[in-house]
Each structure stands twice: as C-alpha cells, then as structure tokens.
Amino acid sequence: MGFSEARAYRAFGGRSTWLTVFLALANSLAVSAKCAADYFVDSLPGQPDSPQVQMHAGHIEINHKTSANLFFWHVANQHIADKPRTVIWLNGGPGCSSEDGALMEIGPYRVTNDHLLNHTDGSWDEFANLLFVDQPVGTGFSYVSTGAYVSELGEMASQFVTFLEKWFELFPHYEKNDLYFAGESYAGQYIPYIARAILDRNKKGESLTRWKLKGILIGNGWISPRHQYLSYLPYAYQEGIIQGGTDSSSRVEAKLSKCLNKLNVEDSTGTVQISACEEVLQAIIDETHKGNRCINMYDIRLTDEYSACGMNWPPDLENMAPYLRFKNVTKALHINSDKQTGWSECSGAVSGHFRALKSKPSVELLPGLLEEGLPILLFSGQKDMICNHIGNEDLIKDMKWSGGTGFELSPGVWAPRQDWIFEGESAGFYQQARNLTYVLFYNASHMVPFNYPPRSREMLDRFIGVDIADIGGNPADSRIDGEKGPATSVRAHPNSTAAAEREKEKVKSAMWKAYYKSGEVALIVVAIAAVIWGVFIWRSRQKHQDRGYEFRGIYPMLGSSSSGSLPRYSNKRGRRGHDVEAVNIYEAELDERPSRVVSARSSREQEPYVVGDEDGSDVDDDTSDERKRLVDKP
C-alpha cells in the first residue's frame, strides 16, 4: 500500500460502511436517472418529413447476472380515438426479429432500395401505440450472455413480464392503456403464454397495477402443431401442389405415415415440435423442385431458388437488412455498440436453444383465456403453406370452450362464415362465436400485413373498437355480409379541428401524469442520497478537524478532476432537460426540430455498419442454418 493510499485508509477507516451505502445509492440514482428521454429517437436516416412519427428505442436489462437485454422500438399513435391503446407486436421463429413487423408489415415505414423510408398506407400506428420487441433474449438487437438463452415458453413469458414492468417504469402513462398483443407464426406460441402470465400477474394483489389486457391477435399462427402437421398434405392437394395418385403423393404420404405413428405413440397433442412430422412439409417442397427452383412455402404463388424455397422472401428484406446495420441507424435506435449485436433477421443460437421440450403447445391455453373473457382473433393468409389456414381452421373446429365446440352457437348450429368486402373487393370472410374471431384473407401470404396493410389495419381497428365517427376522417368502405360496422379509416388521416383539440387535451393530461409519476421516484432517491451524503460529510469533517486532516472528498488521492459517477450523472439526461415520453411532443419542439428528410445521397454517404463481409451480406451463417429448420417461422 502506497503512502497516499495508506493515508486515505487511515483518514477514512471506519467509514467503509458509509461509503458502501452511499455508492449503492449513487448507483441506484444513476439507474433511476435512465428515463424515456434517453430512448427518444430524434430521427431516422431517410425518414420522410411527414407525417411526424414519435419513436423511442433501445435496450432494457431484464437480468443483470446474465446481461439479458431486450430491444424495443416504440411508435406513438398518430391520433387518439376514444381512449389510448397499445399494441405489442412479436414475430416468431423462435428467434426472428420483430423489426420484420416494424419495417415490412404494420409499422409506419418501408425501406426503399436507396435506403430511404417511405410511409406506409394502412400502418397500425394510426390509433394505437405500437411496441415491437426482439425476444426471446438474443433475438435481433437483443442480447444475452452465451449459454443463458431461453429454452421454454414459461421462462420466455416470465422474462417478458419483467420487461413490461421495467418498460412501464420508463413510460408510466402507457401502463393504463388498453393493451393488445399481436404477432404471427411462432408468436402463436409466445402470445398465449404471455397473456396467461399477465392475467395471473393481475390476480396477485392490489400492490401491482393491473394491466388492462383487452385482446390478442395471431396471424398464420403456429398454435396447434398436431393440426398443422396433419394439414400439410390436404393443403397441397387443395392448392394443386401435389396431385393425388401420383408418385409424388405416394412419397409424401409415406412421410405422413411416419408422422402419424409418432403422433399416436406420443399422443402428442402436448408437443410443440416433432421432427418426424417436419419431414412432411419438406417432402412436399422437394416434390416442387424443378431445375434450380422450388415453391415458396410462405407464398405458394411464388417460387424461390432451391433450397431456400421462401427463405429469401419477402423482397423487402434485401433493403431492410443492410439499413438496420448502418452506423447512423443503430446510433439513432440507441443500440449498445459495446455488445456488437449487429442485426440478423433470425438467430440460429436462439432457435437452437428454444426447443420447448417441457412446454405444452399454446392451443391448450386458448380455452382458458377465452373463458376468462379475453377476446382472441386468429387470422390467416390463404396462400401460406407453412402455417396454413386449414390447420388453424381445424384446431378451432376441435377446440372446446365456454360450453361449446368450435364455432357452435348452440348444439349442432355453427356460426356462419360472413363474406368480407373491402372497398368493393372480396377480401375474405369472418367467423366468430364466444369471444373467438377468425378471419381468412384471400390471396394473402404468411405475412398478411405485408400484402394488405389497409385491410389488416381495418381488421385491427374493428377488433379493438375504434370508431372514427367520433373524431372525424374519411371511413373505409368495409362490409361484413353487406353491413358496415364501426367507421374505420385506413388511409386518410382525421382532420377534424374538434378532434385535434380533444387529442391535445388528452396529450397534456397524459404528459403531466407521466412527469408526476417518474418525478416522484427520482425525488425520493435524490432526497435519501442527499441526506446520507450530508450526514457523512458532516461527521467526516468533525472527525478530521479533530485529527488535523483537511477533507478533500471520498478519494483525495484522485485530485479534483475525478471522473466518478456523480459528475457524469449531470449529463445523463442528454440533450433534453426534461422527459419527452408523453404521448406527443410539444408543438413548439416540433417547429424547432430540423427537417427529418435525409437525401438519398447523404444517406448513402454514411458508412454502413456491416456484420461480416464488406459487401454487407444479409445474415450470419447460423441464420441460414436456423431458417432451414422448417418449424422456424418468421
């Protein structure tokens, strides 16, 4: 021990407890100082000037020990209807990023081939806040220590509840929103488990704020593996992919026979994945192999190079993947550059660990959710094969809940299929009974909103109860069995002056509530730390004066230019001196903010953030391996 260190130790011996307590509080203060403003996305490269879109993005730690962080991307609603609503969107995989949903499906923007962002007609942020989350840990921009990946659905749901608790601490005014979950494919497993976890959490007592879960939507869901496996060959026959009585059909039927044996032996209604049954779909795809082409399993109207067979689809992926790797984009989204997470559409490491061997399939949770009063909407794109509509329709037909089977209205009487006409075109059909709604989209793929943003938005607004008759705007012409439902707007933004004034009042109220809630917590921590610090300094000075020492701070040997945590804390809030988490930004701030338009030239001049080769190839090697597993759905 050197002279200065020894002197400091003698000077502050007996103060280690005080020092430990203070440092712990200082650390807590630094953590609590992380606020919504730190996540604010000022602009994105290539973002259009209008309409203004308020966004927040970044990582939230859900487990310090394993460095488990989930990435979120929040998009605020353009307008508030009768009440605020938040839709949480999850893509599937397992291990596929929800940026697919954000930039190719329901989000406000699509990426062009010159790295600009175009606004999407029919995006879901018109009357609902959107929250995209990369989960489980390790998916997309999320990260976790090696070996700490999630393997079961219950564990995934528990981690997601932890994420929501921390997210609502940052954005407290959203905690009182009506809450909906939406997603597709393997999210058909995620979402019912998360819904179950939320309903169970709400029963734990009055100390917790009850989250107002109002419904879930699942598109082309991997919900009942048994029904889906058994639907592959009937779907192939129905769509003319395989002809009965041919050598092709015999080869596929042989694979199906092995699958049936496995299903019967294991009685595996309670199994999420059966490798022997995965071979049925692969056999069908192999029968379409001609030259170097094969059928696209996500949209059977298309072909792809063999053996991708749909893995290169949708075409927007070619633009989106490099965009999400540009340094200026990752910086705008507050990606933790120290972790070098990069971005890939699907993670082989996540899917390799997430086998759900001990988890029952989510179809077994649906009856209980429905009977507890949770509305559920299942929708299917007609031209998807991997999670095709026959499998989902069969699971509904066999499911029992609330005293009936399937869409029974009474014993032997089923709810009719109601024709859906959207803006003069036959769009599909609706069928509903006892809290469950099913929608089939004609001529749509595995990713319905990719094909039909306005139609999918109309479905959402109808499900969550938006009626623009109260706020102004041009309603869409959408009719079910010839009858118009609530007025919904899928293109034109409401322009009612009265609506704008009402919305401004709601924004102001929500903003101040958010300030009060987050401010109270920070004030308490600051007050406690200040009191302890003051007592510590006073007692130390008294002791030192008695001993003839001069007080110079906690670590006098460091001199006056300390780089400790407290000086850094003064800059934690970044460029803004206040929290910008409220539903919308002050009009004055919008006026002062520079234009968000970034020219194609300036966007291209930015150095791309490339994971892997200099050519910016799409994904790492484990991604292609993962997507070859047919159970892995985007």
From Swiss-Prot:
It catalyses: Preferential release of a C-terminal arginine or lysine residue. Pfam families: Peptidase_S10 (PF00450). Residues 1-33 form the signal peptide. Residues 625-634 have a biased composition (Basic and acidic residues). GO terms for molecular function: serine-type carboxypeptidase activity. Residues 475-502, 592-634 are annotated as: Disordered. Keywords: Apoptosis, Carboxypeptidase, Glycoprotein, Golgi apparatus, Hydrolase, Membrane, Protease, Signal, Transmembrane, Transmembrane helix. Residues 539-634 are cytoplasmic. The chain crosses the membrane at residues 518-538. It is a single-pass type I membrane protein. Its EC number is 3.4.16.6. One of its GO terms (cellular component) is membrane. Residues 612-624 have a biased composition (Acidic residues). Residues 34-517 are lumenal. GO terms for biological process: apoptotic process; proteolysis. It is found in: Golgi apparatus, trans-Golgi network membrane. Glycans are attached at residues 118, 328, 435, 443, 495. The active site is at 185, 384, 446. InterPro entries: AB_hydrolase_fold, Peptidase_S10. Belongs to the peptidase S10 family. Protease with a carboxypeptidase B-like function involved in the C-terminal processing of the lysine and arginine residues from protein precursors. Promotes cell fusion and is involved in the programmed cell death. This is Pheromone-processing carboxypeptidase KEX1. It comes from Ajellomyces capsulatus (strain NAm1 / WU24).
